[in-house]
From Swiss-Prot:
Its cofactor is Zn(2+). Its main location: cytoplasm. ATP binds at residue 275. InterPro entries: Cys-tRNA-ligase, Cys-tRNA-synt_Ia_DALR, Cys-tRNA/MSH_ligase, CysS_C, Rossmann-like_a/b/a_fold, tRNA-synt_1_cat_dom, tRNAsynth_Ia_anticodon-bd. GO terms for biological process: cysteinyl-tRNA aminoacylation. It comes from Anaeromyxobacter dehalogenans (strain 2CP-1 / ATCC BAA-258). Its EC number is 6.1.1.16. A motif ('KMSKS' region) lies at residues 272-276. This is Cysteine--tRNA ligase. Keywords: Aminoacyl-tRNA synthetase, ATP-binding, Cytoplasm, Ligase, Metal-binding, Nucleotide-binding, Protein biosynthesis, Zinc.
Length: 481
């Protein structure tokens, strides 16, 4: 087994080799909790959830840490607008974030540290940087990192200092020695949360938080650091500078994290999703209209490093494909029930290999689609199933569930999933499920009375509204086209 990942630091695909055999330490930058999570968060955290699932399925003991930033300028601004305590506001939106992640089927990290609970560690790390000459306190209560002291500052982002200086500036009231320097500690301001420090009361800057929490919960160096590609600069660039300067004499980026992985953006009509453009969707906006597993399935259809376009149309198509997968699993489990165990289908190992190759989920879904086509052909073949055919169907169903467990899909009873997906689709189309059920009952009565003209008329009327009836041994069920 060899797992290959695209490493942002080296811009190459590399074999993922943990520092300690059999164990892997992963840190993912979590959300700044000042509002409900958006589709970009859904994409990001589904990606890293699949990474964790696959690494564990491959036998690695993964320690997964993802933080909450609950002390930040945006949180303070939002809290002031609402007349609310900043920490309380952040806690409320952290709870909402958990609800959204649960709806998407994401596993909880092993540790979820919060900035507000790690102030002593942050202060100690800043003091260490000052002691080592990488940070300075100009005397106004702020502390800054001296960027030019760190020789590999632009290595992750592939930027040099000359390029960066053109866009750098010193804000009024700042006491930076260099426009490139960034704040590690900010002096207290009225109405803001603040903590004691050697430089006076204040609060941490954004970047130092993750460095301190990574070191406390994973040590240094760690194996893998991940997040959205918008964090490459400045956040992850600054994390490297802080963490390496505090813990290593070699001053190489690998002394903090051996590998760096970043996921792409969610776009709307080829533009990055943003509130200013009016194309912003929260996870809750989408889950009010679509099933959570369908959204997850949709997100897995694009390689994690690529940007992709979101629309209701493509999500509805993903929902339809997921329903088809569940229909096939239902048939395979029903027809293969009680069959003697068969060998694991070849598609399962092919799926593992695709995930080993930089977590290629679109390729996995393509492999699964091929296998489902074969399973459908076998399940729909007329006549009684042989013992061998039943065993093949049972093996397919187990294989589908195994691949699904790594992707975080196909984990519900088919009837439950199909009903949930159908009901969301019906609601979007303005179809009343109760009315459909009454029409089905009326059609059943017409058929019992041999009034087939009436039966066909009811069926055709429902079909015209996008409702497809399916007659089976257990009665009539329905779905939305």
């Amino acid at each position: 087994m060899s797992i290959q990942v695209h490493d942002t630091l080296t811009a190459q695909k590399r074999e993922l080799v943990p520092l300690e055999p059999g164990k892997l330490r992963l840190y993912v930058c979590g959300p700044t909790v000042y509002d409900y999570s958006h589709l970009g968060h859904a994409r990001c955290y589904v990606v890293w959830d699949v990474v964790v699932r696959h690494l564990r399925a491959r036998g690695l003991e993964v320690r997964f840490v993802r933080n909450f930033t609950d002390v930040d300028d945006k949180i303070i601004q939002r809290a002031n607008e609402r007349g609310e305590d900043p920490i309380a506001l952040a806690s409320r939106f952290a709870d909402a974030f958990h609800e959204d992640m649960d709806a998407l089927g994401n596993l909880r990290p092993d540790v979820e540290p919060r900035v507000s609970g790690h102030i002593p560690e942050i202060v100690a790390l800043i003091a260490r940087l000052v002691e080592r000459g990488f940070a300075y306190a100009p005397g106004n209560g702020d502390v800054y990192y001296a960027v030019r002291k760190f020789p590999e500052y632009g290595r992750l982002s592939k930027r040099n200092l000359d390029d960066l200086i053109a866009g750098a500036r010193v804000e009024p009231g700042e006491a930076k020695r260099d426009p490139l320097d960034f704040a590690l500690w900010k002096a207290a301001k009225p109405g803001e949360p603040a903590w004691e420090s050697p430089w006076g009361k204040g609060r941490p800057g954004w970047h130092i938080e993750c460095s301190a929490m990574t070191q406390k919960h994973l040590g240094a160096p760690i194996d893998l650091h991940a997040g959205g590609k918008d964090l490459v600069f400045p956040h992850h660039t600054n994390e490297i500078a802080q963490s390496v300067a505090a813990t290593s004499d070699g001053l190489h980026a690998e002394d903090f994290a051996r590998y760096w992985m970043h996921n792409g953006f969610v776009q709307i009509d080829d533009e990055k999703m943003s509130k200013s453009l009016g194309n912003f969707f929260t996870i809750r906006d989408v889950l009010a209209r679509f099933d959570g597993e369908a959204l997850r399935f949709f997100l897995l259809g694009t390689h994690y490093r690529r940007d992709f376009n979101f629309s209701d149309q493509v999500l509805a198509e993903a929902e339809r494909r997921l329903s088809a997968l569940y229909e096939t699993v239902e048939k395979a489990e029903r027809l293969g029930a009680g069959a003697a165990p068969a060998a694991e289908p070849a598609f399962v190992e092919r799926a593992r290999a695709a995930l080993d190759d930089d977590f290629n989920t679109p390729q996995v879904l393509g492999i699964v689609a091929e296998a489902f086509t074969e399973a459908n052909a076998l399940a729909d073949r007329k006549g009684k199933k042989s013992s061998e055919e039943k065993a093949r169907l049972a093996a397919f169903a187990r294989g589908a569930r195994a691949v699904g467990a790594v992707l975080g899909i196909l984990d519900r009873p088919p009837a439950q999933a199909l009903t949930a997906i159908r009901d969301r689709a019906a609601a979007r189309r303005g179809i009343d499920g109760g009315e459909v059920e009454r029409s089905i009952a009326e059609r059943a009565a017409a058929r019992a009375a041999k009034d087939f003209a009436r039966s066909d008329a009811i069926r055709d009327a429902l079909l015209a509204r996008g409702v497809v009836l399916m007659d089976g041994p257990q009665g009539t069920t329905w779905k939305v086209e």
